[in-house]
């Protein structure tokens, strides 16, 4: 018996939110043969639910490691604090950066997010395809109801330039700051998440919970953000 960890965007599904029939068949076959299949993703719970997968999974790691669910039961959750969220929001507003909160109940976007994220969403979904016309949206998007929250798994902000990311690293000493944006190491967005949290951390925690040796683990990913998934299994 093995336990499989699958990244979502770019691995299980493509950047247009489509799941190949081969991927679906592989997941079903793996579970039929007695293996565990878990998602290991930066997505929060509502994003995963909005995918409407028509096959079963054993659970998932969300928020790049700050949320773990097994067979519908939450076994770990460490969101950002209210103070951290306020710091992030005020910083983004001071720099006129569009931002969002990724919570288990949905993705709450700033009022200017849809307008300022058009190019980032186009590049994320279509790369350099000049024939693409409409920027895709996310069914998990919600109107922001509060600028400050205590249930945020991680944040994201649209990069006007790479300097925004570098400045964020200096600004948020009590959070993990990263970038993401599709294939490889393309940086379209910056993000912040709780300190001490990573996909590696969560995989180790889940393996301990299930009493499974790391030698029985297999991880699948497509970008540099998935490299931490490999650390517990090598």
Label every model-predicted segment.
Residues 2, 35, 97, 210, ...:
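Short coil/turn segments at beta-strand junctions that form active-site/ligand-binding loops
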Residues 4-6, 60-61, 219:
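Residue-level marker for buried hydrophobic side chains located in beta-strands
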Residues 12, 69-72, 186-189:
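A short acidic, helix-capping loop that chelates divalent metal ions and anchors anionic groups
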Residues 18-124:
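Active-site phosphate-binding/coordination module
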